[in-house]
UniProtKB/Swiss-Prot annotation:
GO CC term (a single one): cytosol
Domain of life per record: Bacteria
Positions bound to substrate: D90, S91, G92, G93, F94, D144, Q188, G215
Name of the top EC class for this enzyme: transferase
The UniProt record lists the keyword Glycosyltransferase: yes
Protein name: Queuine tRNA-ribosyltransferase
EC number: 2.4.2.29
Assembly and binders: Homodimer. Within each dimer, one monomer is responsible for RNA recognition and catalysis, while the other monomer binds to the replacement base PreQ1.
GO biological process, one term: tRNA-guanine transglycosylation
Species of the source: Neisseria meningitidis serogroup C / serotype 2a (strain ATCC 700532 / DSM 15464 / FAM18)
Amino acid sequence: MLKFTLHKKDGYARRGTLELNHGKIETPVFMPVGTYGSVKAMNPQNLHDIKAQIILGNTYHLWLRPGLEVVEQFGGLHGFIGWDKPILTDSGGFQVFSLSDMRKLTEEGCTFKSPINGDKLFLSPEISMKIQTVLNSDIAMQLDECTPGEATREQAKKSLQMSLRWAERSKKAFEDLKNPNALFGIVQGAMYEDLREESLRGLEQFDFPGLAVGGLSVGEPKPEMYRMLRAVGPILPEHKPHYLMGVGTPEDLVYGVAHGIDMFDCVMPTRNARNGWLFTRFGDLKIKNAKHKLDKRPIDESCTCYACQNFSRAYLHHLHRTGEILGAQLNTIHNLHFYQVIMAEMREAVEQGKFADWQARFHENRARGTD
């Protein structure tokens, strides 16, 4: 089940509601990444506290560990991980294609060696749909060939054509399995605007309830990613949700929303948190730096997260320098809370028709820097 309602537009920025089998999501939305069924350093209550509406699980990793037979015993990923809100799963393709020296690609699918025990494994559109059906994610993704940003035109065209054939197979398998959830198609085409449009037009025949933009944030220069967003975002179908995969910084989220994107996921806020890199309204802060050793202030005096309401920069600096687990948890709570606040503010700005003003103020504040 998927029902998307578009409430308001302000330029290309959109404010909507996405209804799924495990609940309703207000868009634009950021989805914390729970690769192995766990958002690193966060428990489900932490996620509820920061107002996370939906999280992402990784099909490839959950297939390898704990394995489908385990998750199936719990009726799906929700029961296994104790999360009652929506979940989106990727197709597993990105991770498999990252194993460039351990995989073989054919029209049928991809053969690769398990990085865990060396077993020979095979992933196809049909197998990806079977895995995601067992996981019972509210949103599943088609299997696509993940095109590197530096692909030649010929490589990108050949790749997107295979992804379109796999889109058809993914949809058929999804329907044959009687999966009650939603399946998204993925727009590919590397850094070629006309190929992106060709991919989008090719997907129209399958009438997926939502569409994702894939193959960005894969090593290409930032201006190239933004160029593709400017080209693709505004031509995505208005009545469907738009998902930008694997992106990104706070600035990337704002740029994406400004160009018609509704959904985002990225490991950046959690990974950076574990490395002591904190996002704030007034720029980024590196908590490991010695200047924070005696600082009694919170990370961000305007922030209402648990970390900022209760602890000093000095304490967080100490936790990071000593490698305490609590430091990673508090940093992660703060970063994910900050991302959720940005999304909530953008939703409100679009509702009020003041997105451009909000965007200008956001960039002005972020450029100011922390002290």
